[in-house]
Amino acid sequence: MSRLLEESLKTCPIVKRGEYHYFIHPISDGVPLVEPELLRDISTRVIKMIDTEVDKIVTAEAMGIPIVTAVSIATDIPYVIMRKREYLLEGEIPVHQETGYSKGELYLNGINKGDKVVILDDVISTGGTLVAIINALKRAGADIRDVLCIIDRGNGQNIVEEKTGYKVKTLVKIEVVDGKVQILK
């Protein structure tokens, strides 16, 4: 199995803001450059791990978009993006999102009661975004079949499972130690 993701994480830059060390990576930030080979590797691995007998894939704006696009093209499953702005469409579901570094609203459109869905996102750290997505999908009456994040950094998996009952799958677990990304699994 290819390990492009893991190798790219080991060499990505780290920036410190306050006391927090951010890793800057193409999948989580879209910079410095998103290589097709990396996106292809990730989407291939994702497809092997998720239920593909679903109606829709759901992600939050913004960095889940390249991932769901690649998975959608490969599987012919359409996707829905929870946006950060309101569109005022009929049936739109607003949900409050709180992460370790921001607060705001997300807006869900395009989900019908009974839709079988998979949630995909780029990074889980505090779990706040995933909890918001899951709550919105439950309000819409969706049948959540799988939840997967590419990169796991922090305790978000446990928080999501405690708050929602859903287990979050991930491709890689990391932590930042001494200014470098360490691969834990």
UniProtKB/Swiss-Prot annotation:
Pathway: Purine metabolism; IMP biosynthesis via salvage pathway; IMP from hypoxanthine: step 1/1. GO terms for biological process: IMP salvage; purine ribonucleoside salvage. Pfam families: Pribosyltran. Belongs to the purine/pyrimidine phosphoribosyltransferase family. Archaeal HPRT subfamily. This is Hypoxanthine/guanine phosphoribosyltransferase. GO terms for cellular component: cytoplasm. It is found in: Cytoplasm. One of its GO terms (molecular function) is guanine phosphoribosyltransferase activity. The keyword Ligase does not apply. Its EC number is 2.4.2.8. PROSITE patterns: PUR_PYR_PR_TRANSFER. It comes from Methanococcus maripaludis (strain C5 / ATCC BAA-1333).
